[in-house]
């Protein structure tokens, strides 16, 4: 009979598909265990049994975790022996009630799918894949907890400038992915805090099985008051005691902290108001609630020793929202910014579409006008160890920056240097300062164009800007008049047969407020991947209404300096579209340009003949498109 030996195990199997198959089987066949937490717990117990089995067997020795050794009837007994050995070795982690509850038929199925796989070779990713496939976005998404994707963990560890003796804490460690990878990369002084008992147990158990000698993952809420901590927590997780914080804190509007006792511990637990004279933000009163990621910024600084560093993942809105400037002021006054890395909006898919940034701080008095590193990652790849080169380029540039005492010879979106005095309106978004766009503007300015600020044209009343309206869902489908939304603007024109249409009565209510005229330019101001799209209103397009995410630009008087066609051309140039892209801020999952269209520099030709030619060509194209559209509509009329 053929038995599996330790040497026969392979890492060539696709763990992702194996777990999907197991999940589907157990969900339909495992009696008495339907909750995802219980399914994951049973799978976790089997995974650690297999890991221990591989660790305990010699290369030429048969493994216990197989169906046929010595025969199928002893399978459950062998698995229980492995589990009891783990139970006895780690009685403070596993509880008395913990046991293998899976029935023999289901156990045989699971073992049949895993027996040839080498868990040791997959130790960096096995837990993450297990949770992704068994619980997916439901893991703790309702509590603001999302898996830290493997590429982002790679980035976090690549940004560490530490030695192996560095004392590291993750105060919201979840299943321990960040700490597990830190441990496997040679950082052995690792500590974790997790308020969810189930997740804390998983992280601790997996770490000790990987070789971590000490129980350093503790159940507890990092944000709770110090006096409410257990003696064990006070002994092991103290303030001013860590060299490095690595954390992906829970975030989201659905999980606010509203406990007054917790809030009053933090400066950021209070409301702040901007002093109109000094421009500084002043603390005024306790907030009713605060997002957890905000409080984690302050708590992590408290955990750090003087000179310690924090690498924290934050939603982009924290670093850009006008109402959150008091947070930026707090950061600037209580720490030194070392680096800010922008991650793509797809980084945490499929769990959340929230755009994030990585902020690296040092707990130290900030120097005067110091410099710091910025980098932009536009794309990453999941479920593969060979990540798209954006991450590698940013890591390499940051390491060069550190070795060169805070300087870079070459600047690119993958690495550039900013000073505190370079900041505008306390905006900490790397895209906003993209050096590629700044260089493009310098090159254009030296050519045959002058750069005119859009906002200056509005102030001079050369351009008038209005916005659309939200008419309410009850108005949809009440008539035949197009209600134009952001998705209805494409290819320089509008879709006059949109999904949403309204009645004559609704149109009459808004027609004078919106005042849509031929020659107006519609501009998408909000909406993921749509911002910057433009359409020129033709005489056939005027009987419409536009939603509030669309702006209407009108050149008040066509002149030799500017007319509607030249403005339309300028807005659609690559340099304008790049500027617009760099000024988009993402609040949670909503992209918006806000009033930053005013900051966009329009390229206006200096040569009258060049300007005239651009106007004529743009006009010709737009009129031809309008004529073709009209002709096609007539063709369809029977």
Where are these regions (language model features)?
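A short glycine-rich beta-alpha junction/loop motif
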Residues: 359, 543-551, 584-609
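Low-complexity, Lys/Gly-biased intrinsically disordered segments
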Residues: 248, 445-492, 590
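Conserved S-adenosyl-L-methionine
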Residues: 142-247, 252-263, 314-317, 327-328, ...
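Conserved Class I SAM-dependent methyltransferase catalytic core
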Residues: 281-361
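Non-catalytic DNA-recognition/assembly elements of restriction-modification systems
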Residues: 401-469, 604-638
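Flexible, glycine-/basic-rich loop-and-beta segments that form/coincide
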Residues: 2-6, 350-450
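A short beta-sheet element
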Residues: 485, 512-514, 518-571
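Long recognition/docking surfaces used for binding and targeting
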Residues: 34, 41-137
């Amino acid at each position: 009979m053929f038995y599996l030996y330790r040497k026969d195990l392979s890492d060539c199997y696709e763990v992702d598909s194996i777990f999907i198959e197991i999940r589907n089987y157990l969900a339909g066949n495992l009696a008495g265990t339907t909750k995802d937490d219980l399914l994951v717990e049973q799978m976790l117990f089997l995974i650690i049994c297999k890991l221990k089995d591989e660790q305990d067997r010699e290369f030429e020795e048969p493994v216990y975790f197989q169906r046929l050794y010595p025969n199928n009837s002893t399978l459950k007994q062998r698995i229980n022996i492995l589990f009891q050995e783990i139970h006895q070795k780690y009685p403070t982690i596993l509880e008395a009630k913990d046991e293998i509850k899976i029935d023999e038929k289901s156990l045989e199925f699971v073992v049949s799918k895993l027996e040839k796989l080498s868990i040791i070779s997959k130790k960096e990713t096995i837990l993450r894949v297990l949770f992704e496939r068994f619980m997916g976005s439901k893991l703790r998404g309702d509590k603001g907890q999302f898996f830290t994707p493997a590429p982002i963990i790679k980035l976090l560890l690549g940004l560490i400038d530490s030695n192996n003796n560095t004392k590291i804490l993750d105060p919201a460690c979840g299943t321990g992915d960040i700490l597990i990878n830190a441990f496997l990369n040679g950082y052995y002084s690792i500590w974790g805090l997790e308020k969810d008992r189930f997740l804390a147990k998983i992280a601790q158990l997996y770490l000790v099985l990987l070789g971590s000698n000490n129980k350093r993952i503790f159940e507890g809420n990092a944000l709770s008051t110090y006096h409410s901590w257990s003696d064990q927590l006070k002994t092991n997780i103290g303030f001013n005691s860590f060299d490095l914080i690595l954390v992906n804190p829970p975030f989201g509007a659905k999980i606010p902290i509203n406990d007054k006792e917790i809030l009053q511990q933090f400066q950021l637990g209070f409301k702040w108001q901007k002093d109109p004279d000094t421009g500084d933000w002043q603390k005024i009163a306790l907030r009713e609630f605060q997002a957890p990621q905000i409080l984690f910024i302050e708590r992590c600084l408290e955990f750090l020793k003087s000179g310690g560093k924090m690498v924290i993942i934050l939603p982009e809105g924290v670093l850009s929202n006008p109402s959150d400037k008091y947070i930026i002021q707090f950061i600037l006054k209580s720490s030194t910014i070392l680096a800010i890395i922008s991650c793509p909006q797809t980084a945490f898919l499929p769990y959340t579409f929230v755009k994030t940034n990585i902020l690296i701080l040092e707990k130290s008095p900030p120097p005067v006008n110091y410099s710091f590193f910025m980098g932009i990652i536009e794309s990453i790849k999941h479920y593969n160890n060979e990540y798209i080169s954006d991450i590698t380029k940013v890591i390499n540039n940051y390491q060069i920056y550190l070795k060169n005492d805070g300087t870079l010879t070459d600047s690119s979106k993958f690495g550039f240097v900013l000073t505190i005095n370079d900041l505008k309106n306390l905006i900490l978004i790397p895209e906003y300062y993209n050096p590629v766009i700044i260089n493009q503007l310098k090159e254009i300015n030296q050519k045959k164009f002058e750069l005119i600020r859009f906002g200056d044209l509005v102030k001079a009343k050369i351009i008038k800007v209005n916005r659309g309206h939200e008419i309410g869902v009850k108005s949809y489908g009440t008539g035949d008049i197009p209600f134009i939304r952001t998705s209805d603007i494409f290819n320089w024109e509008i879709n006059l047969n949109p999904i949403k249409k309204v009645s004559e009565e609704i149109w009459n209510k808004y027609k004078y407020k919106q005042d849509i005229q031929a020659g107006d330019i519609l501009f998408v101001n909000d909406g993921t991947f749509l911002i910057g799209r433009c359409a020129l209103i033709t005489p056939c397009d005027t009987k419409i209404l536009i939603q509030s995410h669309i702006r209407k630009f009108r050149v008040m008087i066509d002149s030799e300096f500017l007319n509607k066609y030249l403005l339309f051309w300028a807005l659609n140039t690559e340099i304008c579209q790049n500027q617009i892209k760099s000024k988009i801020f993402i609040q949670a999952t909503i992209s918006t340009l806000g009033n930053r269209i005013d900051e966009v520099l329009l390229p206006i030709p200096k040569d009258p003949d060049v300007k005239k030619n651009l106007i004529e060509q743009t006009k010709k194209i737009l009129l031809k498109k309008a004529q073709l559209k009209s002709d096609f509509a007539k063709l369809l009329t029977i």
